[in-house]
């Protein structure tokens, strides 16, 4: 239950941060560092970051985000599936 709540919160955070960074880019204001965006994605927020990328059309031309976030999302999905698997792997 706690893990599921964490996953929801970190992915909401990832989505929100991508929206904020896009808006700040349009306004030519301070930006959220790519390192911070990657950190959120790496700590199981890749789904939220990816959804934010698609929704806000942000970082979609950066190869590291374009290919890295979906790859990280697949890895995270596999790890979560293994964790919640009823089988002893």
From Swiss-Prot:
GO annotation, cellular component aspect: plasma membrane
Signal sequence region: none
Bilayer topology term: Multi-pass membrane protein
One Pfam family, short name: DUF1294
Main location class: membrane
Domain of life: Bacteria
Keywords: Cell membrane, Membrane, Transmembrane, Transmembrane helix
Localization annotation: Cell membrane
InterPro entries: DUF1294
Membrane-spanning residues: 5-25, 36-56, 67-87
Name the UniProt record assigns to this protein: Uncharacterized protein YsdA
């Amino acid at each position: 239950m706690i893990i599921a709540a964490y996953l929801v919160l970190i992915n909401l955070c990832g989505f929100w941060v991508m929206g904020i960074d896009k808006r700040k880019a349009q306004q030519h204001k301070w930006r959220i560092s790519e390192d911070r965006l990657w950190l959120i994605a790496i700590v199981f927020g890749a789904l939220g970051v990816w959804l934010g990328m698609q929704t806000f059309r942000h970082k979609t031309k950066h190869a590291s985000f374009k290919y890295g976030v979906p790859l990280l999302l697949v890895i995270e999905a596999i790890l979560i599936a293994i964790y919640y698997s009823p089988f002893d792997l």
